[in-house]
Design a protein with these regions (language model features):
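Active-site pocket-lining/capping segments in soluble small-molecule metabolic enzymes
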Residues: 1-139, 144-176, 201-332
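Conserved catalytic-core segments centered on acid/base and nucleophilic motifs
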Residues: 142, 190-196
Length: 332
């Protein structure tokens, strides 16, 4: 990096202050994957895939925030089929949550942190049914923001009532702020964990040391999550946080949840802009971290939809993705 050389001539060294690089990788040996959040329906997914082709980049995962419960069964099946063909993981937020309910607490200034949690036993029942409904359509990845719900879903998975290949992605709404909290979520059965978008590289290194699970991190976040814009930092974030899902939100964009037909045109425009931001970040990575490897479409460990009927009899195998420590040898 030419800038580091200029700093060293003045007796300064930015590289010496950077935490050590992670030796952990995704199962395919890659360092990172690209995620586009707030992909709220099939039309938005198709726009993301089209924009990715235009920029000649790979989007490995998309996530959705409005909730699986707000998509019709036919649309869930179409979403699963299109994503499966493209080799893209689709992670749907479990729909029922306090932020949608009758109670005022989660919509208050001090209670907003409860918006993603599930209220009461009936709420848990609805949430589990929402997952089962999406699983029947082929979806295999879910955003969870309630520790009790996570525990129940993992228990059902262990009992063979949910597919072994299902993944449980911890939402930024329940992001751990320290390594101990991250370890708790790891122990409850999370398969990938979103940490706060404003972590320093030192804090990212601490989080990485606490778990071998993939970490999800907003490289750019919407204003509701702090509005950080860190595309130029992608090489450092990946090197320190590997295996890392680099998420691209969009500052100065409107909130979308819950999305519907009245917002889908805006959701498409926002999603296209996010893909463009990811393309810019990858240019920065090529400039400053060319040895860092991104997973290909359909890579091992991605929870790509399986648009085939689920049955307990076929539900066998290891439920977790391995994380390897060997440095990959394949080119980027």
């Amino acid at each position: 990096m030419k800038a580091d050389e200029a700093l060293r001539r003045l007796g300064l060294s930015a590289s010496e202050s950077r935490p050590a690089a992670s030796d952990r990788r995704f199962p395919d040996g890659a360092h990172f994957r690209i995620e586009i959040p707030s992909v709220e329906n099939l039309r938005v997914l198709e726009a993301v895939l089209e924009e990715a082709r235009r920029h000649d980049i790979v989007v490995n995962r998309v996530s959705q925030g409005s909730g699986a419960m707000l998509l019709g069964e036919s649309e869930l099946r179409e979403l699963a089929a299109v994503a499966a063909e493209a080799g893209v993981e689709v992670s749907l937020f479990v729909g029922p949550r306090e932020g949608y309910g009758l109670g005022a607490h989660a919509r208050s200034a001090e209670g907003a942190g409860h918006a993603g949690q599930v209220r009461g036993l009936r709420g848990l029942s609805y949430a589990i049914e929402d997952v089962a409904r999406a699983v029947e359509a082929g979806i295999r990845s879910f955003l969870v923001a309630d520790p009790g719900l996570l525990m129940l879903l993992r228990d059902m998975q262990s009992a063979g009532e949910l597919p072994v290949e299902c993944g449980w992605k911890i939402s930024v709404a329940m992001a751990p702020s320290n390594p101990a909290a991250l370890m708790v979520l790891d122990g409850l059965g999370a398969t990938t964990i979103n940490i706060p978008s404003d972590v320093t590289t030192a804090e990212l290194g601490e989080m990485r040391a606490a778990t071998s699970l993939p970490i999800d991190l907003y490289v750019e976040s919407p204003d509701s999550l702090g509005g950080v814009v860190r595309e130029n930092e992608l090489a450092d974030l990946v090197a320190i946080g590997s295996p890392l899902y680099a998420k691209f939100g969009l500052r100065n964009s409107r909130p979308l949840y819950p999305a519907g037909e009245h917002l889908y045109d805006e959701a498409i425009a926002i999603a296209r802009a996010k893909v463009a931001r990811a393309a810019v970040a990858l240019e920065w990575l090529a400039r400053l971290g060319s040895d860092l490897v991104q997973s290909a479409a359909g890579a091992e460990g991605l929870r790509v939809p399986r648009p085939v009927p689920f049955s307990a009899e076929s539900n066998a195998g290891d439920r977790d993705d391995p994380v390897v420590t060997a440095v990959p040898t394949q080119p980027r």
